[in-house]
């Protein structure tokens, strides 16, 4: 499937235990963008990493200590942060919390293998509405 359904219902959408006190739920995606809900247990760590995707993170609840390219800030409900492609970033959550991550392009590693195999790149480049 090259995109998610138009509507996503939290009580019907799979929540994946990704280990280390983290759980992830896909909210929606296509070939351009992806939104994911992530639960952090108290004390959970999202270890520093980099990726080619732009990322915006919105804090739904809890307190997160975000480090982006060596700068650490404390973010709480209603706060957000932006990570440019290849920015070194990570977060700890001393309270437990929930955040929404948005990626562009989507994180292929969060999807089943082959999710975008049927995308016609030439068609995408000429008219993205046709994909």
Task: State what each model feature region is.
Residues 70-85:
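Short acidic-glycine-tyrosine-enriched beta hairpin
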């Amino acid at each position: 499937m090259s995109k998610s359904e138009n509507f996503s219902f939290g009580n019907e959408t799979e929540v994946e235990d990704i280990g280390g006190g983290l759980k992830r739920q896909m909210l929606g995606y296509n070939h351009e963008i992806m939104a994911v809900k992530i639960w952090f247990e108290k004390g959970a760590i999202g270890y520093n990493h980099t990726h080619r995707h732009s990322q915006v993170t919105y804090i739904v609840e809890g307190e997160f200590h975000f480090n982006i390219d060596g700068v650490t800030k404390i973010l709480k409900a209603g706060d957000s942060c932006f990570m440019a492609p290849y920015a070194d970033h990570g977060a700890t959550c001393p309270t437990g919390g929930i955040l929404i991550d948005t990626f562009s392009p989507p994180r292929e590693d969060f999807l089943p293998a082959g999710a975008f195999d049927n995308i016609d790149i030439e068609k995408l480049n000429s008219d993205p509405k046709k994909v």
